[in-house]
Amino acid sequence: MPKTIIIQGSSKSFGNTHKIVKYLSSNEQYDVIDLKTKNIGPFDYDFANATDDFLPLMEKIITNYDTIIFATPVYWYSMSGILKDFFDRLSDLLHYRKELGRQMKGKRMAMISNSNENDLKDGFTMPFKASASYLGMTYLGDTHTW
């Protein structure tokens, strides 16, 4: 049976994004990773953050899950900074750990966002859709709540 994980990308572990994630994970028994609890540095071409939590976390995700749901608040018309760092670090899978990155192909991705507005600005979903396409993943869709 396919397994799903929700990656909670909020700078606030117990805010509105957490409420959504908690509801979904309890009803569907999805596993959750709170990026706020992880030490994930920014991407750099020198691979200076090779020993942080990103690569072990990606090994766990790629090995154990078929579907990844990203949950993020809207910060300044975009995904949260903590989730953006995570997305930037996907470059590690294209440069330094290609064999791991290739295993993203065929997996599924979805996105949940929330803010104090009832809709998203144009372009918000583009990084999710484009990343899924580039990595050979199926983009299942997205939803926004407020």
Language-model region placement:
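Short, glycine-/small-residue-rich phosphate/pyrophosphate-handling segment
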Residues: 99-142
